[in-house]
Amino acid sequence: MLFRSGTLPTDGATGEAEWTGFVPFDQLPHLYDPPSHMIVTANNRPSGAPGAPLIGMDFPTPYRAQRITDLLTTTAAAHKLTPDDFARIQADTVSLHARSLLPRLLAHVQPTAQMDREAVDLLRAWDDDARADSAAAAIFEAWFLRLAPSLAGDQL
């Protein structure tokens, strides 16, 4: 049988594309009382053993889950977590993606036009906080969306 990932339409008229069963519960990704005593997810790809059943194709990058883990770890080291801590962590908008990638991108930029120089100046001064009113965050995201296809080339 041809493997169907679900990323393309299939012919629903014949019944050949129907589900043939479910992944057994014990094969689904799971954690029980991990050493860190916390389980964090931000819709990122669950880690699984090689050969684990396919449970999805499109997952966000792990940056958000990593940021949540970092904030939980540092906050819990300082004091017992409170509902206010969880609210602050939930509302956090710092972009680890930008923090990781932006210094490397800026190292290779030599803007010539005034508007480009202003954009680069905003990015260099940015605190990596992707607040809704952040011009630098908007510039970074637009830049990355234009840049990503050229970095990945035919792999996309």
Model-derived regions, located:
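Long, compositionally biased non-active-site segments enriched in small/hydrophobic residues and glycine
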Residues: 1-156
